[in-house]
Amino acid sequence: MQRDLTVDEFLNYLYINVKELFTLKEKSFHFWRNSLISCSKTKNFLFVVVGDEVLVYDLKEISSDASEPEPCFYLHCPHEASSSRQGDINQDMPNVINNVRCELIGDLEYFITANDCGKVAIYDVQKLNREPIIYDVQHSAWGLAVSPLRILGISSNSHNVNLFHLSPEFKRFKEDYHSPWFRQETLVLEGHEHNIPCITFNSSGTLLLSGSIDRSLQIWDITSLSCLCKFYTKLSIWGVKFIDKNAFYHISILKHKPGSLIPAQQFGQSPWKPPIMSSSAFLLSHEEDFDDDAVFEGEYYVHIQDELPKTKVKNYFRTYLRQKPEELFIFTTKFSIVLCAYMGNSQIFPLVSSKNCFEEPITPRFQALHRINMIECIPELQSVVCASQSGQLTLLRLICTTKILNGNPIYVYSFVPHKIRLTHLVDAPLLGMSVCPLYPGEENPFKRFKIMLTVYTGKVISVEVQLSENLYDTSHIGNIPL
C-alpha cells in the first residue's frame, strides 16, 4: 500500500547544523542596511562589513573555539568623503556600506559593495589588492544584482535602477548606434515613486524585477528598457528573487480531492492607496494598520502546522495555472512571503503566501525591525532562504506538481516553510545573510551549503544545510510503503 509524503518526512531529508563561528568585539555596526556579509563561491573568503570598511577572513583559519580571528585582508573605502555628498541614513557618514554581494561574472568572481552616498565598488576576489572599479549612482545605493549577460543592476534612493555593462565587449556596444548603449555609460529604468531596496534578474538576464517602498513591483525588459508589468501590494516591498522553474522539486500526488485547488487569479492591478511620495510620509505611515497583504490569504495562505506532524505535503498546494509560467518569483514585505507567477502579457498571478514561517523574536523590541529583506536561492537544495532583520531565518522547500483537470494539464507551484531555530544564538537583529557551498571552489556532490549570518552584536553564525540523497530515491515520493 502507498501513501502521500508528510511534511515531517519531507523536511527531515534536510540536515541543518547551526553554530557560532566567532564574535567581532569592539566593532561599530550600523542598523537599517540591506546585507553586511558575503561569502565567496570560489575561495574560502568571508567578507564582513564594519561601517565603511570590509574585513576579509579566511574560513580555513577560523578555530573551533569561536575565538575572534585576525582578518587576512582589509578593504578600505576606496574614495574620500566629500562635503558635497551626504549619506541618506547618516549625512555625516556617506561612505557607510549598505549592501555587499559576491557574484560570478563570466569565469571570474567579484565582490561588490554599495554605499550610502551612491558609490559602488567592484573588487576582483582573486586579486583583492587591486584597485576596484567604481560606479556612481549619485544616491544611496541598495539593491545589487548581476545578470548572466554581464549587466550590473543597482537600485537606489533616486527611485531608479541603473544598469552598467561589465562585458569586455562594452566598447563595441557603445559605438553601435543600433544598441541602447550607444554613447551611454549607464542605462536607467524609471517608473517607481520611492526608494528601491531590492532587484533581481531572471536566469536568462532578459528581465529585471524591482521592488519598492512605494508598494509596487515592476518587471522590466532589459532589451527595450520598458516596464512590462506593474503589480501593487498593501505594504512596502523589501525583497525580491526570481526562481528558476527547475529549482522546484516535483511531488507526485496519489490522491487529491476535487476542488482542493483553486485557479490562480490576478491581483494588484491598481494601487491600494495613494503611493508614498516622500521619506517622511513613509516614516509616518502605519503599515501595521493593514492585515499584511490579506488579499493573498484565505485559500492562498500556507500555515505552518507544528501541532500536526502528519500534515501531507500536498496540502501546501493552493492554486493552479492552466499554462506554464514564463517566470516564477518571490517577493517579501514586513511579514509576508509571496510566491508569484509571471505569465507574460502583463500578467502576474500570486500562487501562495505565508507570514507565520518564522519563530518569534527573542524579544518583542526586535519586532519593530521586522522586515524580510534578505533572500537567497539554493537551486541544488530546491530551496529559498529568507531572513528578517528582527533575527529570524526560514528555509522554503520549493515544490511543484502537474495534474490533469477536465482533460487538460494544470501546473501547481508552492513551498513548504521550514523554521530554522536561532534564538539560542541570535541575541540582536540580523544585519546580513549570504549563502555559498560548504567548500567553495570544489565539487559539491553531497549538496552541502552554508548560510552565513552576521548579528548586530558582532556574532558571525554559520548554518550548514545538507540534502539527504535519499530524497532522490523515487520510492519516497508519493510511493512510501505503509
Curated annotation (Swiss-Prot):
SUPFAM superfamilies: WD40 repeat-like. Keywords: Cytoplasm, Nucleus, Repeat, WD repeat. Coiled coil: none annotated. It is found in: Cytoplasm; Nucleus. One of its GO terms (biological process) is nonfunctional rRNA decay. WD repeats lie at residues 92-133, 191-230. It holds the Pfam family WD40. One of its GO terms (cellular component) is cytoplasm. PANTHER family: COATOMER, PRE-MRNA-SPLICING FACTOR PRP46-LIKE. This is Uncharacterized WD repeat-containing protein C27B12.05. It comes from Schizosaccharomyces pombe (strain 972 / ATCC 24843) (Fission yeast).
